[in-house]
Regions:
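N-terminal membrane-anchoring alpha-helices
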Residues: 2-46
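Acidic donor-binding loop of glycosyltransferase active sites
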Residues: 129-133, 306-336
Length: 437
């Protein structure tokens, strides 16, 4: 590690010194996060690089992604790596992603919370897990983790690499810093040529465009009993949904429902917030608008009078997408860059979104070109488009079909990513075989 650290720019030297000095304050930060529901009390030590889980024998691939979106994108890749008889350690930073990992990771994969990025905790993490290969997903770049990986001679690969124009412009202000971090990576696998070009401009080498892994995710699962119960509760009612919504978007959906219910009196709007703990606040918004609303987290199903059904639970978007022929994908009216439209598209929904979709810019551009999605800007344009689709099911089906065909044509990133990783996996196998001889 020291050899790599000697070549770092002053900014990263300063970062390493500051994070080392801040190590005694770590319990204060973790305690604050625990109070705000951002940590699991039984797993706090993982943030300090301590684990109650033993390292499995044999070769170990470490995969790190920030949160739910990155984890969902990489689960099929993890499954394929496990099939090759590698153990996989998966780290992420949020409680929601930890819950998702518990539900969806394959046998042979272990989840841990990512450590706080201080030299002491990072060294403790590496001393315990001793990964043979490190894979970072998209854009969650922690300097001490990256520098230590390189310093210990662990091959480091970026998969599904994404660098928005906004992030690119920020990194350009510290060119030496980002060039040093990207220089630690043996291989950068980018989502598109545009992202690859930005990485190249910032100093990365060995860049390959492999495509977006999120295009190859399977349909989200739905628990059979839960789906049957929800279907029975809604009956023949007309359903629209808002998925992975952020603050402000629920107000738009509630207002749009008020505008639509005169023409469609049996309309039911389902809202699945990105952060389920916001459910009670959304309930208040609906009640303030004079609408009958209920929360799924209370074990309630929509009744005949329910107008807004708030699905404030984790891992149940598959239920919503199987019932709603029209889905608004959140994070796109709010300035969050948009959430993933792929899953509802694969389940046959017609997609609406706001103008802020830079997280999935290439996908939305392709959907726009194929007329596979429609942009809305407020409750008025949303209600107008939904009303038109509810009156003309053929038009709605045409849009949904165009979206499915577009997503299918853009796919293949998983196989290209696996092909790029295979030489590294083969090298690990050979080294293990030689050490056991």
């Amino acid at each position: 590690v020291e050899v790599v650290a000697e070549r770092l720019p002053l900014t990263l030297h300063a970062y390493r010194l500051l994070t080392a000095a801040a190590t005694p304050l770590a319990p204060v930060l973790v305690s604050y996060r625990l109070k705000h529901g951002k940590e699991l009390p039984e797993r706090l030590t993982e943030r300090y690089g301590e684990s109650t889980v033993a390292r499995p024998p044999g070769p170990l691939v470490w995969v790190h992604g920030a949160s739910v979106g990155e984890l969902l994108a990489v689960i099929p890749l993890i499954e394929r790596i496990c099939e090759k008889d590698f153990a996989v350690l998966c780290t992420s930073g949020t409680v929601t992603s930890a819950n998702l990992a518990e539900q969806r990771l394959p046998k042979g994969a272990i989840h841990q919370f990512v450590i706080l990025d201080t030299p002491r905790f990072v060294d403790r993490f590496f001393d315990h897990w001793k990964p043979d290969l490190a894979i970072f997903v998209e854009s969650d770049l922690w300097p001490n983790l990256i520098v230590t990986s390189a310093g210990r001679g662990i091959p480091l690969i970026l998969v599904n690499g994404r660098l928005s124009e906004r992030s690119f412009n920020r990194w350009r202000r510290v060119p030496g810093t980002i060039a040093a971090l990207l220089g630690c990576f043996d291989l950068c696998l980018a989502q598109s040529d545009a992202h690859a070009g930005r990485y190249r401009d910032l100093g990365a080498s060995h860049i390959v465009t492999t495509g977006n892994l999120k295009l190859d995710v399977p349909e989200p699962p739905a628990q059979a009993d839960g789906l049957a119960a929800l279907k029975a509760a809604v009956g023949e009612r007309t359903i629209i949904a808002g998925a992975s919504t952020h603050a402000g978007e629920e107000t738009m959906l509630v207002e749009a429902h008020r505008r639509l219910r005169g023409a469609f009196p049996r309309l039911l709007t389902m809202i699945a917030p990105r952060h389920p703990d916001r459910g009670p606040g959304i309930l208040e918004i609906a009640h303030a608008a004079g609408l009958d609303a209920t929360l799924r987290s209370r074990g309630e199903l929509p009744g005949s009078e329910t107008e807004i059904y708030i699905a404030d639970t984790l891992g149940e978007l598959g239920l919503i997408y199987r019932l709603a022929p029209i889905v608004f994908v959140g994070g796109s009216l709010a300035s969050h860059g948009g959430q993933n439209p792929i899953e509802p598209i694969k389940l046959g929904a017609a997609i609406l979104h706001g103008p802020n979709v830079w997280n999935f810019a290439e996908i939305y551009a392709a959907l726009g070109n194929s007329h596979g999605a429609q942009e809305v800007t407020d409750a008025g344009t949303f209600a107008e488009r939904v009303g038109a689709w509810l009156q003309d099911a053929n038009e709605r089906r045409t849009v949904a079909k165009a979206a499915r065909e577009t997503v299918a044509a853009l796919g293949g990133g998983l196989e290209r990513t696996l092909a790029a990783l295979e030489p590294y996996l083969m090298q690990i196998r050979l080294e293990r075989r030689a050490s056991n001889a």
